[in-house]
A protein has these predicted regions:
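Active-site C-terminal subdomain of aminotransferase-like
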Residues: 24-116
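General beta-strand structural signal in soluble alpha/beta enzymes
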Residues: 1-2, 19-22, 175-177
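Conserved active-site segment immediately N-terminal to the catalytic lysine
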Residues: 12-24, 34
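Conserved C-terminal alpha-helix-loop-beta "cap" of PLP-dependent enzymes
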Residues: 120, 124-188
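Short, solvent-exposed loop/turn segments at the edges of secondary structure
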Residues: 14-15, 29-31, 135, 184
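Glycine-rich, charged/polar anion/phosphate-binding loops
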Residues: 20-23, 72-75, 123-127
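Catalytic PLP-binding core of fold-type I/II PLP enzymes
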Residues: 1-13
Length: 189
């Protein structure tokens, strides 16, 4: 799953046999759709492996020991609306306008650096992922560590964050920055 990395981080594609990504994550386009890219090694495995159970049509990439080429030549598994397609085309034009993948990677890295600098100056916050080498530039998750917040139990913290996020959205500052539901109460940028 390259959703969090593609267009935002250097990826060694020679080591990746199958790559999937959504149009939403880094590109900011429609969330319901995505893409798949496969290597020649993956094609070989698809054409030689016979699964012991039936594969649902939606997930079938090979039939009768042959790659189903249509989906890699412009066919679709599930038809997206043309508005969604235009949305991702606009997103790709933006990537091209900022210097291609190198430009979008640079922007992603710079955004992470801005957050790192801000957190370094604000002792009330910390990254959920404390190891800088493992920290993602596309799913930056921040914890509030000040006592006014940590004195609440988890439910109370989530309530405080819900009010905060509502205010930020109302003021036009941020949208959809709530941490993942199974993560500790957090801010996800």
């Amino acid at each position: 799953d390259a959703t969090s990395g593609i267009f935002a981080m250097d990826m060694d594609y020679s080591k990746l046999d199958v790559i999937t990504w959504s149009w939403q994550k880094v590109l900011g386009a429609e969330a319901a759709h995505g893409m798949i890219a496969i290597s020649p090694r993956a094609v070989e495995r698809l054409e030689t492996h016979i699964p012991p159970w039936p594969i649902p049509k939606l997930f079938r990439l090979a039939s009768k020991k042959k790659l189903i080429k249509g989906i890699f030549e412009g066919g679709t598994i599930n038809t997206p609306s043309m508005i969604c397609v235009e949305d991702v085309l606009d997103a790709l034009k933006w990537v091209e306008s900022v210097g291609g993948t190198k430009g979008s990677i640079k922007i992603s890295s710079e955004n992470l650096k801005i957050c790192e600098d801000w957190i370094a100056k604000n002792e009330n916050f910390k990254f959920m992922c404390e190891d800088k080498n493992l920290r993602s530039s596309t799913s930056i998750t921040v914890l509030i560590k000040d006592e006014w917040f940590t004195k609440h139990d988890e439910e109370g913290q989530r309530g405080v964050l819900k009010k905060l996020f509502s205010l930020l959205e109302k003021e036009g500052v941020a949208n959809d920055i709530n941490g993942y539901p199974k993560a500790p109460p957090s801010i996800r940028i």
